[in-house]
């Protein structure tokens, strides 16, 4: 064939190619789907760890879980026996909240110590120590252990490449957070806590937890500014050395203060130039300076700040009398340790006691754990931070005597504390009921936005579904929304929005769960919250064998102050008169006495 004839055929071939129909395009559903990350199914049970291999394979690490098998579901003999004998959380709660006469007998015997040791070890063992994951690392890493700027997390985040926001269950898009707030969390009518919890408790909860819940606004919700990760009283002394120094008097170990109408109060920002969050227009001399920058928000928070300031300076006077050769620094540091001990004592024996509703009398005794394996170190978890948004406690308005204060009148009220005085506010807050936390629809509209932001934050943190946390803390997952809520109306609405009970989010699940009978909240809040709380309290260094001795607290006097601390002592040893003070509203059948009485000499 000649070269010329070949050249003439090329245009013809090109023309034929152009006239051919294009190859058929397969519809999207006919294409080979991308493999789903197998860990999105949460296949590993009983704290097994899911490790992905390749695109569609996984392996469960069942090491030391007590289970074996591909998904850690086959119990070992000892595990099977233990599970067979272990009562359910609901049965244990019933047992601990019924039969008062039986528990009065137990509380008077050595059995109380045995049960308390069992409670502390069983609860604390549910918290991983050292810490495991954080917002940036869903696997064991040195960064997760060493970088205390992160909150830790108990469960890794939902993998990024899952079919739905909560893994594989539920809808492709989560419900609008504002809609959830309005439908399920907004208060219709104030529901008081049936256990009798009061505002003195509610403000203590806020004041106490703000020493270790200090999310970094600059870094994001997975980071904290409270680098002590526990009860270090940073809300009294500041979370850094510069702030501490601004608040200290540098004389006899004391903190700065001002005297108004013969009473000790925190200094003004003029006297202690630290950052405090007050609205514009409030003069510096009207702003009180304390360890936590947000405590000017509520008079109840500044009430506790004032009480602990007075307590610190009172303890310093007692230590100075016992140790006249001690300098300012040693007096300050020892007083701080005593106040840490007093705080933990009050929290365990009165605060947690009130929350639990147990007839078993809880006991703060670090020596109970000296024979057990226990790590005296703590790391605050983002799940604990999420769980502790207890805004249903807040009432519709605030009463002091016969005077009612709206939120607009109460927030940032800088004169109420000095106008009424500590005693009158303690008495008023101790008599006003707080709201029930669980069960839903009990958050006042003034603070609803905080709950909505909590839901949004949990999505940014990619927290696993509520049922996964129930399994992680030894509870049976709920099978339906009706089982969760105990009623039909909310259950049907939740079903419509989420599509599947296994897609329910962590925080809404905690607040919407049906409460135990006559209780402040439901099973999950107790079973998940208690381990975090007790591990954080008993994991404090002062509870260790090296620290728990008289010399740490300046001798037997300081040691006894820790071991005998009560809420009533905190108030009545730092006021001129002794008001009614408790974490529980008074029994109307027993409370016929005056609102304020003289301090007891036994305090």
Swiss-Prot record:
Its EC number is 1.14.99.1. Brain cortex. Isoform 2 is expressed in the cerebral cortex and heart. PROSITE patterns: EGF_3, PEROXIDASE_3. Pathway: Lipid metabolism; prostaglandin biosynthesis. It is a peripheral membrane protein. CDD domains: EGF_CA, prostaglandin_endoperoxide_synthase. The active site is at residues 210, 388. Gene3D superfamilies: Haem peroxidase domain superfamily, animal type (1.10.640.10), Laminin (2.10.25.10). Its main location: membrane. The cyclooxygenase activity is inhibited by nonsteroidal anti-inflammatory drugs (NSAIDs) including ibuprofen, flurbiprofen, ketoprofen, naproxen, flurbiprofen, anirolac, fenclofenac and diclofenac. Disulfide bonds join 39-50, 40-162, 44-60, 62-72, 572-578. Its cofactor is heme b. Residues 35-73 form the EGF-like domain. Heme b binds at residue 391. Glycans are attached at residues 71, 107, 147. It catalyses: (5Z,8Z,11Z,14Z)-eicosatetraenoate + AH2 + 2 O2 = prostaglandin H2 + A + H2O; (5Z,8Z,11Z,14Z)-eicosatetraenoate + 2 O2 = prostaglandin G2; prostaglandin G2 + AH2 = prostaglandin H2 + A + H2O; (9Z,12Z)-octadecadienoate + AH2 + O2 = (9R)-hydroxy-(10E,12Z)-octadecadienoate + A + H2O. GO terms for biological process: cyclooxygenase pathway; response to oxidative stress. InterPro entries: EGF-like_dom, Haem_peroxidase_animal, Haem_peroxidase_sf, Haem_peroxidase_sf_animal, Oxylipin_biosynth_metab. Binds 1 heme b (iron(II)-protoporphyrin IX) group per subunit. Keywords: Dioxygenase, Disulfide bond, EGF-like domain, Endoplasmic reticulum, Fatty acid biosynthesis, Fatty acid metabolism, Glycoprotein, Heme, Iron, Lipid biosynthesis, Lipid metabolism, Membrane, Metal-binding, Microsome, Oxidoreductase, Peroxidase, Prostaglandin biosynthesis, Prostaglandin metabolism, Signal. It is an enzyme of class 1 (oxidoreductase). The conversion of arachidonate to prostaglandin H2 is a 2 step reaction: a cyclooxygenase (COX) reaction which converts arachidonate to prostaglandin G2 (PGG2) and a peroxidase reaction in which PGG2 is reduced to prostaglandin H2 (PGH2). The cyclooxygenase reaction occurs in a hydrophobic channel in the core of the enzyme. The peroxidase reaction occurs at a heme-containing active site located near the protein surface. The nonsteroidal anti-inflammatory drugs (NSAIDs) binding site corresponds to the cyclooxygenase active site. Belongs to the prostaglandin G/H synthase family. This is Prostaglandin G/H synthase 1. It comes from Canis lupus familiaris.
């Amino acid at each position: 064939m000649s070269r010329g004839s070949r050249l003439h055929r090329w245009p013809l071939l090109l023309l034929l190619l152009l006239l051919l129909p294009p190859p058929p395009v397969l519809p999207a559903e006919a294409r080979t789907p991308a493999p789903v990350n197998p860990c999105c199914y949460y296949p590993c049970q009983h704290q097994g760890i899911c490790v992905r291999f390749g695109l569609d394979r996984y392996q469960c690490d069942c090491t030391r879980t007590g289970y074996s098998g591909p998904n850690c579901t086959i119990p070992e003999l000892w595990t099977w026996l233990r599970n067979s004998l272990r009562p359910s959380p609901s049965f244990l709660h019933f047992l601990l909240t019924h039969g008062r006469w039986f528990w009065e007998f137990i509380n008077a015997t050595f059995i109380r110590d045995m049960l308390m040791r069992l409670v502390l070890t069983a609860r604390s063992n549910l918290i991983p120590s050292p810490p495991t994951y954080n917002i940036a690392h869903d696997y064991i890493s040195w960064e997760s252990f060493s970088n205390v700027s992160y909150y830790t997390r108990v469960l890794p985040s939902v993998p990024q490449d899952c079919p739905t926001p909560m893994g594989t269950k539920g809808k492709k898009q989560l419900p609008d957070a504002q809609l959830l707030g309005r439908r399920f969390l907004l208060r219709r009518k104030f529901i008081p806590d049936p256990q009798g919890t009061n505002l003195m408790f509610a403000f203590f909860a806020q004041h106490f937890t703000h020493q270790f819940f200090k999310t970094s606004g600059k870094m994001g919700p997975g980071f904290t500014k409270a680098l002590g990760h526990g009860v270090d009283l940073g809300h009294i002394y500041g979370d850094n050395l510069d702030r501490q120094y601004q608040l200290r008097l540098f004389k006899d170990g004391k903190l700065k203060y001002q005297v108004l109408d013969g009473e000790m109060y925190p200094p003004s920002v003029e006297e202690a130039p630290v950052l405090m969050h007050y609205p514009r227009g409030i003069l510096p001399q009207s702003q009180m300076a304390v360890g936590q920058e947000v405590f000017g928000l509520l008079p109840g928070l500044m009430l506790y700040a004032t009480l602990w300031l007075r307590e610190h300076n009172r303890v310093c006077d007692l230590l100075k009398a016992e140790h006249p050769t001690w300098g300012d620094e040693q007096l300050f540091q020892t007083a701080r340790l005593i106040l840490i001990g007093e705080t933990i004592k009050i929290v365990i024996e009165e605060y947690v006691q009130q929350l639990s509703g147990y007839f078993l009398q809880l006991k703060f005794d670090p020596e109970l754990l000296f024979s057990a394996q226990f790590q005296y170190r703590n790391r605050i978890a983002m799940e604990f931070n999420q769980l502790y948004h207890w805004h249903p406690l807040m009432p519709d308005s605030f009463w002091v005597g016969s005077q009612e204060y709206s939120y607009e009148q109460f927030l940032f009220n800088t004169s109420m504390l000095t106008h009424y005085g500590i005693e009158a506010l303690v008495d008023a807050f101790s008599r006003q009921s707080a709201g029930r936390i669980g069960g839903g629809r009990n958050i006042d509209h003034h603070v609803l936005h905080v709950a909505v932001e909590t839901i949004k934050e949990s999505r940014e943190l990619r927290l696993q579904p509520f049922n996964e946390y129930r399994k992680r803390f030894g509870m049976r997952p709920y099978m339906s929304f009706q089982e969760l809520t105990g009623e039909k109306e909310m259950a049907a609405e939740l079903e419509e929005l989420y599509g599947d009970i296994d897609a329910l989010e962590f925080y809404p699940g905690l607040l919407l769960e049906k409460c135990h009978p006559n209780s402040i909240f439901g099973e999950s809040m107790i079973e998940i919250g208690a381990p975090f709380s007790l591990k954080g309290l008993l994991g404090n260094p002062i509870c260790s064998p090296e620290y728990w001795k008289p010399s740490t607290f300046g001798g037997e006097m300081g040691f006894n102050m820790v071991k005998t601390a009560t809420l009533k002592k905190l108030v009545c040893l730092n006021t001129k008169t002794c008001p009614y003070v408790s974490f529980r509203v008074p029994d109307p059948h027993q409370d016929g006495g005056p609102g304020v009485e003289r301090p007891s000499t036994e305090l």
